[in-house]
Amino acid sequence: MKFTDNIRQLIVRHHLLHDGERVLVALSGGADSVALLLVLRDLGYPVEAAHCHFHLRDEEANRDASFVEQLCKRLDVPLHRADFNTKAVAKVQKVSLEMAARDLRYTWFRKLLRERNIRFVA
């Protein structure tokens, strides 16, 4: 059985998505999120991608952002991108960079879900 067939069975068995339901994929540019995007797309789910640029890793993060943009363009997947001044937010809120990045990401994802009328972030 193919990997995608296993994923389809998992989705159906647990009633995770309806046929044809749009999914917002949190796309970092890493192997896991790219695989998730490709599998959901191959299974016929309309996907949109959301990429967060936290400006914490300089050139590496810029390369990730560029890769995500090129991938989405090639696959004709709508891409939503947010740029965050994570260091400033962490300083103002007196939290760690990780906590600030998580809060920024989750807040933005909730906003995108409402605006795009999508139920899930994958």
Protein language model features and the residues they cover:
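Core alpha/beta nucleotide-donor-binding catalytic domains of modification enzymes
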Residues: M1-A122
